[in-house]
Amino acid sequence: MAKNYFDITLALAGVCQSARLVQQLAHQSQCDEPPLRVSLQSLLDLNPPSVRAVYGDNPANLRMGLETLQNVLNASSREGLGAELTWYTLGLIVLERKLNGNRGAQAELSRRIDALDRQLSHFDLLSDTLISAMASIYVDIISPLGPRIQVTGAPVVLQNTQIQAKVRAVLLAGIRSAVLWQQVGGGRFQLMFARNRLFKKAKQILSHT
């Protein structure tokens, strides 16, 4: 059965969007709000009718992620900001595999996200309350699976507890996209042997956004 590279590329762009948001937060103490909202919202729909639906039914919502994916696929340097994006992306993919092999963690994650959905009727998605709840899910369920993702940035920024919470919430959203990527046929071999195909598909999707 032929793989759907549109869905695979879109879900992987979701992972990369989280990577870029983490990088922005770690270095600048802030990030672009529209893609942040899209990424965090993706956490709350665990039974979507399509991959597009996870991201607001509009690939343009993943423009940041698609551009970051192209950068990751093109990255030749192992240093600097490009390397950070690659490590964050790969780190999220590795953690998803750990989650996939742990039924207990999956069940607890589903339960906690259901509770998040209920809170959304009382708080805005980007409120400190919901961001903190998402961060707690990451700390309680994802972090213990290991290996931990080492976030690099400005030390004074990374010591800020609100930034720490946002980073963890965004990493949780990245895990959600990594789960989706696997569900639609994504795999690590594509990052080695289908890089050109993924790059072209990302470019094609971007040209229509």
Curated annotation (Swiss-Prot):
The UniProt transmembrane annotation reads none
Q: Which InterPro entries match?
A: HflD, HflD-like_sf
**Keywords for this protein:** Cell inner membrane, Cell membrane, Cytoplasm, Membrane
Annotated localization? Cytoplasm; Cell inner membrane
Top-level taxon: Bacteria
Q: Which SUPFAM superfamilies match?
A: YcfC-like
Q: How does it sit in the membrane?
A: Peripheral membrane protein
Q: What are the cysteine partners in each disulfide bond?
A: none
Task: Give the GO cellular component terms, alphabetically.
Answer: cytoplasm; plasma membrane
Which Pfam families does the UniProt entry name for this protein?
A: DUF489
Q: Which HAMAP family match?
A: HflD_protein
What NCBIfam families does the database record attribute to this sequence? PRK00218.1-2, PRK00218.1-4, PRK00218.1-5
- The name on file for this protein is High frequency lysogenization protein HflD homolog
Native source organism of the sequence: Sodalis glossinidius (strain morsitans)
